[in-house]
Regions:
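C-terminal accessory/tail domains of diverse enzymes
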Residues: 1-210
Length: 210
């Protein structure tokens, strides 16, 4: 659910990230790594659901690792450089790979503790929401729209408000203003000017690394 939801809401990939995003960053999205990666992810998720039906609650945890390990990678095949890193979740290769840890590597440490707390609240709410009702919507083929739109603050803000509304409908009373510091930090104002009753605001945008 988290993989698909993050994919369909690019604001979650970019709002909390560092300045280095894109295919050669430390935490590329699935659709930034290889062109066929999303298709392979859909097949992998289908296999996970089939195994869940087959094994039920007794499904071996290493099946998730073996199914996703070669998909959650960057362009070089590095399993650590991925938006969702499962290196330390449940790898059967070594004991250090079976720590039950899921790394969200696109999350940069924010400059204030309260910004970190509200991020944690967001993650807890999304996990709770998908625990009750798994996310099964089809993956969106963003194509070039991903970097054409979601490097800009207006599109990130609009998409993130959809996430807030989704959580509110699920019973979590989220307020988008809680994340105003994150927007100001990620897309700082360069300058503003008022002309004939019109206001022009110029902000920094993101730039993908290729």
């Amino acid at each position: 659910s988290l993989l698909l939801y993050w994919h369909n809401h690019p604001s979650l990939s970019y709002l909390f990230s560092g300045m280095f995003v894109g295919p050669t960053s430390q935490a590329p999205r699935v659709d930034e790594a290889r062109n066929d990666q999303l298709y392979e992810l859909e097949i992998a998720i289908e296999q996970i659901y089939k195994n869940r039906e087959l094994y039920g609650q007794s499904m071996p945890p290493w099946l998730v690792d073996r199914t996703l390990r070669n998909i959650l990678i960057d362009v070089t095949g590095n399993t650590h450089r991925s938006e969702f890193s499962i290196d330390k979740m449940y790898s059967p290769d070594s004991s250090t790979g079976r720590l039950g840890l899921l790394e969200l590597r696109a999350f940069e440490m924010p400059p204030h503790a309260r910004m970190s707390i509200v991020q944690q609240l967001l993650l807890r709410a999304l996990v709770a929401r998908f625990w009750r009702q798994p996310y099964t919507r089809p993956a969106i083929r963003w194509g070039t729209r991903l970097h054409d739109r979601f490097m800009l603050p207006a599109f990130v803000r609009a998409d993130f408000e959809d996430v807030m509304e989704d959580l509110r409908q699920a019973g979590h009373a989220f307020d988008g203003t809680w994340f105003a510091p994150h927007f100001e930090f990620r897309f700082p104002i360069v300058g503003e000017v008022d002309v004939l009753g019109m206001r022009l605001t110029l902000r920094n945008a993101l730039e993908p690394w290729h």
